[in-house]
Design a protein with these regions (language model features):
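Short, structured segments at the rim of ligand-binding sites
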Residues: 1-428
Length: 428
């Protein structure tokens, strides 16, 4: 299998440009299905999850053209089915956004139960609750969920928990429903706002995105537009953590500093210097890292998608830190991999107690999921010796050109291709 090989101990320095937000792109691309003319989406991250989102539309009949590396033009007028192919949809969790988009397009969707990273049961009960409130019925058959409505009607929906996926999926389904839909206890993440901005640019009538009450007044038509996706908050946070872990000095460009405030606050608490500019942040770390307690929370709290990366950083901080995961269950599987490198971490339920060590040691490790893989890279960059990371396909789902970007910052890192894999052995 392909691997990332990292020789640690080099301070990162220089500039890195952040790509478009994965979590926005995987909802915006399915949303194009509701447009009555082609859309051009810019600042699209060139990653496998996004390519898969586009492949799903192609399989349903849409005309998809890539105009360079980070721009895609999609003509949805040729879509001829409301069924997402099982072999594609099962590969990623974000495939469930096709339910909301297809409901908006034709009031019926047949989509495989979602895949993606496995942090537990990943229930979609809040999605179903929203769809039922809008007038839908649903059934499950052979791993496929079928959702349909004779007519979508606006409704008042209270989410039992703050959930990004359900918030965005209900927005998609409600955009063309008759009347007013109100979502209470809605997620406030930047990618929720980006989806709403995209839909409003198409002609939707959505207000309150970025607050916990979102109102959607249904419209009849959505037009094709050109739209640029926001920068990726989690990719930016990953490079910020890597700069701190290696005692580096890195300018992280093409970011929205306000989206990074919770990450910035914790880094500064650990003794890292962070300077904000209009569309960049500079991260510099000269001395030892201090212990810090972190609890993941829905936005604007500390993001769960940065939890593994901050754990890698805390593992080399002075003192004892406590990391509490309040969003996902079963998100500490990567801890065993960090322990292979010498980290001293004890997991108790939804908390990890991290005793900082002077340094980590390079070792063979696995990327157990997307963000855990990013944590392994950070640990490898800071470690003494060589780290070999397997199962890197998880990392490639969410980070564009990650090797090239880290090498550009001075890292000693490369991709080792599996010579027995005929697909990858041809690369380069």
């Amino acid at each position: 299998m392909d691997k990332f090989i990292i020789k640690g101990g080099k301070r990162l320095h220089g500039e890195v440009v952040i790509s478009g937000a994965k979590n926005a792109a995987v909802a915006i691309i399915p949303a194009v299905a509701m447009a009555e003319s082609p859309c051009r989406i810019e600042n699209v991250p060139n990653i496998s999850d996004v390519k898969l989102s586009a492949r799903i539309l192609t399989a349903m009949g849409a005309t998809v053209r890539w105009l360079g590396k980070n721009t895609v033009e999609i003509d949805p007028t040729t879509i001829h089915t409301n069924v997402v192919p099982s072999e594609l949809g099962r590969k990623m969790r974000g495939s469930y956004y096709n339910i909301g988009a297809l409901l908006g397009r034709c009031s019926k969707a047949i989509v495989p139960l979602p895949g993606g990273c496995d942090f537990g049961v990943r229930p979609i009960d809040q999605h179903i609750k929203g769809f039922k409130a809008l007038g839908c019925t649903y059934s499950l058959n052979d791993g496929m969920i079928e959702v349909s409505a004779k007519e979508l009607r606006g409704a008042h929906i209270y989410l039992d928990m703050v959930t990004v996926g359900a918030t965005m999926n209900i927005i998609l389904a409600a955009v063309k429903a008759k009347g007013l839909t109100v979502i209470e206890n809605a997620a406030r993440e930047p990618h929720v706002v980006d989806l709403a901005n995209f839909l409003n640019s198409m002609g939707a009538n959505i207000s309150g995105a970025g607050t916990d009450v979102i109102k959607i007044r249904g419209v009849e038509h959505l037009k094709g537009i050109t739209y640029s996706i926001i920068p990726d908050q989690i990719e930016a946070g990953t490079y910020m953590a890597a700069a701190a872990a290696t005692r580096g000095d890195v300018l992280v460009k093409n970011v929205t500093p306000k989206h990074l405030e919770s990450i910035t606050a914790k880094l500064m608490e650990m003794g890292v210097t962070v300077v904000e500019y209009d569309d960049a942040v500079r991260v510099r770390c000269d001395g030892p890292l201090s212990k810090c307690n972190v609890k993941t929370m829905p936005h604007p709290g500390f993001p769960t998608d940065m939890q593994p990366q901050i754990a890698a950083l805390l593992s080399i901080a002075q003192g004892t830190s406590i990391l509490n995961e309040s969003v996902w269950e079963n998100r500490f599987r990567y801890v065993e991999e960090l322990k292979r490198m010498g980290a001293q971490i004890t997991v108790a339920g939804k908390s990890a107690i991290i005793e900082g060590v002077e340094y980590l040691k390079g070792a063979p490790v696995r990327a157990t999921d997307l963000r855990a893989g990013a944590a392994m890279i950070i640990a490898g960059l800071a470690a003494h010796g060589v780290t070999k990371i397997e199962d890197i396909e998880h990392i490639q789902r969410g980070y564009e050109d990650i090797v090239e970007k880290f090498v550009g910052l001075g890292a000693d890192m490369y991709l080792m291709l599996d010579p027995t894999n005929s697909d990858t052995a041809k690369i380069g």
